[in-house]
Design a protein with these regions (language model features):
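Nucleotide-activated chemistry modules centered on ATP-dependent adenylation/adenylyltransferase
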Residues: 1-41, 49-268
């Protein structure tokens, strides 16, 4: 369904010109039968509020938590991103949450950031040569356009494990004056357009749930189960949260409003 994907991305980030659209020509068509699976879902997990909320709503051994660290904005020059420190931090995060949710887990590393995409050049060409000027493009640009494609480096694993349903925690923002405004690379229209080999995204978790309510749900779920988890929300690409950026501050306030101390949830 490449034409559908292209049309949807054009609607959000474009309009794109028809001649920009690539194509895939199959020389041979063969039947692909997905193997039987003991799993129901892949739940994408970054450690943030949206991802943890998706995890607590889909716990247990029938679900596989999948983390793709390169979806996050990472500066190539920093050791915690190009070396083992950053990867080890992500492994620890998903391993600890898998113990909380009692799900299996998988961490996928790729070379998209380091070797495949020259992000600065692509962003510049899209703006100056292709003249993209949509509201969504100015909001998150090439980072948003590549987001789901990068996330779908998990696709071969999903197929090999026989998993047909992909679950993504929604980052949709509820804005009363413009309720359907969602200028993010994880826009539900974009994820809904992606279908391949019997695999597709399910309805995004928490699509119409406010962030403050998600944090409250996480706290209540953990307290009911007698468990605790870290929540990773920092804008910084360091292995430690700064606790002073916008995302850190608002998450800590959400935790306080839920009656908890942020220190016990990965802050400070």
């Amino acid at each position: 369904n490449l034409p559908i994907i292209y049309a949807t991305y054009s609607k959000i980030y474009g309009p794109f010109k028809e001649e920009w659209c690539g194509k895939v020509t199959a020389k041979t068509v063969v039947e692909n039968k997905m193997p039987k699976s003991r799993f129901d879902n892949i739940v994408f997990f970054s450690g943030g509020v949206d991802a943890v909320h998706a995890g607590i709503n889909n716990p247990g051994k029938r679900n596989v938590l999948v983390s793709v660290p390169s979806i996050e904005y990472m500066e190539k020059t920093k050791e915690e991103n190009s070396g083992r420190d950053f990867i080890n931090a992500k492994i620890q995060l998903i391993r600890e949450f898998s113990a909380v949710s009692e799900s299996d887990w998988l961490l996928i590393t790729n070379n998209f950031v380091v070797d495949v995409f020259d992000d600065e050049r692509i962003q510049r060409d899209l703006k100056d040569s292709f003249l993209l000027n949509s509201e969504a493009f100015f909001f998150d640009g090439w980072f948003g356009i590549k987001y789901l494609g990068n996330l779908l480096s998990a696709a071969p694993f999903a197929y090999a494990m026989g998993i047909s349903n992909l679950i993504l925690g929604s980052s949709f923002e509820q804005l009363e004056d413009n309720f359907y405004s969602n200028l993010d690379g994880s826009n539900p229209e974009l994820s809904d357009s992606i279908k391949f080999a019997g695999i597709s995204f399910g309805k995004q978790d928490g699509l119409y749930t406010r962030r403050s309510q998600k944090v409250k749900n996480i706290v209540e779920w953990c307290n009911t189960c007698g468990k605790r988890t870290k929540i990773r929300t920092c804008f910084s690409d360091s292995t430690e949260q700064c606790c002073v950026c916008t995302k850190c501050v608002r998450t800590q306030l959400n935790i306080i409003c839920a009656g908890e101390n942020p220190i016990h949830w990965g802050f400070g």
